[in-house]
Amino acid sequence: MEKREIIKIIENCAIKYKNNLSNKNLLFVYYDKNIVKYIETKFLPSNFLHLTGIKYKRESNNNAIKFYKDILDKKVSLKNLKIVNEGIIKLKLNILNMILDINYSAKMIGEFNSNFKNLLRTEKIIGTNVYSMGFIKVGDYYIPNTTLKEDIRNITNKTNRVIAIFSKEIKEKQYSKLTYINKKTELVQIFKIKK
């Protein structure tokens, strides 16, 4: 995969990330042993670079936020991209566009099984039978730190069914938008939430 092709895919995905996830909290509601539970996630501009699998080096201001701004402004130079593992980048870029719809399409959640990949440091996995996104807890929220082209059931100790997803802007106090509800779930069930 050539760097120009990689940049084009990432530019399109950055726009989708900006529209769907950036500066938003998502609340994933799920069943665990017939008890309704949830986790709260936070998506920041600085998280986008981690989801792509690439490394970004500039002469000055080498950070994930600068990369996100540069990619949206179409100012990323080929010489500043570092491809560490082309195979991993191909896998990530094959699913990145789909996974950025996680606010509408996540079906399962589970604890990461560290026996799957010893070097991968993530805690919660949210996804489908095609893709998964990993999250680590930072403060009160889980933030995304990886994407995997992998059936969630293969990389978690146990999966739980996502029954609803709520979204809000980070600055809002309350969740204002229901983006997904499992067709077998009634709203009244969701409001019996326990942490």
Region locations from a protein language model:
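An acidic, glycine-rich, mixed-charge low-complexity segment common to nucleic-acid enzymes
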Residues: M1-L120, K168-K195
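Active-site metal-binding core of divalent-cation-utilizing nuclease and nuclease-like domains
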Residues: R121-T128
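Compact beta-sheet-dominated globular domain cores
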Residues: T128-I181
